[in-house]
């Protein structure tokens, strides 16, 4: 039965979320016929949404009406029909309905190309990827006011089909606000905008603008670190966020301001000896848990460094699974900043001997800047997955199938070791750029197409290909600077 549906994997999660958004859009349309709805970035286990009611503010009563309508749609368990249209007709229809960004996206496609339209009780919209068969499958959601809009909160694959406890995340919201300012500066809000610029030969200029904006933000962080006399900079974020490149660029900016090169180190060099690595629930070594770090040694060495003492920083030998000493004996110079990058950097247990006022915490993630249209956007998780897939193939010899197989375990580890500590950050850095998915497509598309139908990862590969087909390719160009975060994934200039 539909009401018994449960999210079992990330393909299910994406389908559930798309279906819930469709139900939400239908409900808003039913309650406020002429309202203009925008689905924003993912936030607090859900999606931030803004409803334009023609000048008046959204009220608690309005939200109750929308929630009640959603519950009725779900209880009715209406079939979601996938209709097929031509790109030409779809473009004409969306233009007549006042959705120019949807219309332009389809107008760019071959006229006779098939476009899928999701239909729910006479309401139609493009969701670009997988859907559940009926509205009754969405058996759990939460709708609550947030800032000038509301949050549609949903279960996911990592929390056993439950909605995690709500916690406000001001820093992440502020980072999304910065994304909106960047979009306004570049004039690129939707996918059709960047596709148009690519076709007009302006890709290099978009790359330069995006990289300049990102560099300016890193400069501001460095200025804040120096002005506030911070002694330790802690950088953390989920897989494929671009932590290593960001840490190096922060170091370069601090050196520019102070004339002193920060002391940079990664927590990976402080792993316990491999035989002492704790086991996870699956009985295999858990290299991502805090127990895999030699906390006693790390804290002692950080305390000694800040006291001006000489320290023998280890270098971890990943082949033999042991720390090697004697290669990096150093001490902090006067006013030299210590920059630490690693999974657990925002967890205060890692640096419990360092006073909070001496720390500057940076949470980094590729918060997606580009929206497909006002109702659809590339998720942050998918943005990171594309990065990881390309990097795994470029530098580690893994195919896309192997990356997809490993991804659930990676995300499960992040939900325990990284995301719970993101709200403790002083700043959130968005490591994505508006052009990156268009460029990553050049590398990722052939990898995904190579996954055979017999593979257990075939459905997930097809889901990604479904939405990625609307992104025009940017071939790797020299316009991407050597220190760009994207270079961490696509490789150096040739």
Across the structure, where does each feature detected by a protein language model lie?
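Auxiliary tRNA-acceptor-end handling modules of aminoacyl-tRNA synthetases
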Residues: 2-15, 27, 36-216, 221, ...
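Hydrophobic anchor at the beta1->P-loop junction of P-loop NTPases
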Residues: 233-235
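Walker A (P-loop) phosphate-binding loop of P-loop NTPases
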Residues: 240
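Conserved lysine of the Walker
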Residues: 243
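Hydrophobic positions on the alpha1 helix immediately C-terminal to the Walker A/P-loop
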Residues: 246-250
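Post-Walker A helix-loop "phosphate-sensing" segment adjacent to the P-loop in P-loop NTPases
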Residues: 252-263
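Conserved nucleotide-sensing/catalytic segment adjacent to the nucleotide-binding pocket
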Residues: 263-265, 272-321, 337
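Conserved NTP phosphate-binding and transfer environment spanning the P-loop NTPase/kinase superfamily
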Residues: 351-494
């Amino acid at each position: 039965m539909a009401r018994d549906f449960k999210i079992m994997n990330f393909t299910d999660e994406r389908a559930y979320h798309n279906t819930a958004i469709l139900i939400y859009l239908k409900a808003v349309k039913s309650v406020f016929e002429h309202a203009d709805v925008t689905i924003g970035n993912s936030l607090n286990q859900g999606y931030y949404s803004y409803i334009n009611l023609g000048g008046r503010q959204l009220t608690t009563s309005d939200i109750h009406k929308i929630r009640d309508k959603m519950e009725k749609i779900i209880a009715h368990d209406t079939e979601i029909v996938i209709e097929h249209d031509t790109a030409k007709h779809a473009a004409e229809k969306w233009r007549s309905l006042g959705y120019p960004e949807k219309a332009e996206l389809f107008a760019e496609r071959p006229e006779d190309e098939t476009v899928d339209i999701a239909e729910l009780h006479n309401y139609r919209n493009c969701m670009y990827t997988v859907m559940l068969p009926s509205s009754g499958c969405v058996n759990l959601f939460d709708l609550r006011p947030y800032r000038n809009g509301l949050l549609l909160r949903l279960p996911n694959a990592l929390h056993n089909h439950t909605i995690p406890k709500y916690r406000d995340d001001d820093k992440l919201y502020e980072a999304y606000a910065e994304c909106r300012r960047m979009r306004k500066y570049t004039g690129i809000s939707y996918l059709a905008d960047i596709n148009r610029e690519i076709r007009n030969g302006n890709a290099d200029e978009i790359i330069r603008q995006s990289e300049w904006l990102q560099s300016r933000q890193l400069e501001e962080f460095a200025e804040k670190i120096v002005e506030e006399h911070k002694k330790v900079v802690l950088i953390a974020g989920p897989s494929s966020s671009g932590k290593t490149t960001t840490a190096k660029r922060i170091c370069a900016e601090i050196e520019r301001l102070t004339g002193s090169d920060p002391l940079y180190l990664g927590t990976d060099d402080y792993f316990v000896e491999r035989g002492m690595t704790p086991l996870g629930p699956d009985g295999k070594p858990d290299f991502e848990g805090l127990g895999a770090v030699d906390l006693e040694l790390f804290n002692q060495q950080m305390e000694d460094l800040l006291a001006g003492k000489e320290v023998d920083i280890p270098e971890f030998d990943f082949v033999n699974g042991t720390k090697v000493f004697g290669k990096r004996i150093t001490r902090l110079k006067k006013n030299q900043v210590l920059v630490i990058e690693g999974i657990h950097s925002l967890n205060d247990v890692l640096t419990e001997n360092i006073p909070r006022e001496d720390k500057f915490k940076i949470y980094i993630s590729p918060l997606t800047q580009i929206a497909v249209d006002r109702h659809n956007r590339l998720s942050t998780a998918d943005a990171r997955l594309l990065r990881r897939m390309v990097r795994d193939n470029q530098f580690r010899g893994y195919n896309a199938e192997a990356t997809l197989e490993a991804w659930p375990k990676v995300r499960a580890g992040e939900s325990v070791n990284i995301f719970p500590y993101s709200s403790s950050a002083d700043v959130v850095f968005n490591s994505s750029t508006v052009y990156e998915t268009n460029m990553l497509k050049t590398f990722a598309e052939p990898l995904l197409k190579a996954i055979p139908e017999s593979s257990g990862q075939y459905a997930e590969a097809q889901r990604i290909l479904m939405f990625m087909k609307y992104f025009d390719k940017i071939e790797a160009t020299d316009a991407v600077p050597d220190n760009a975060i994207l270079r961490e994934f696509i490789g150096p200039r040739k």
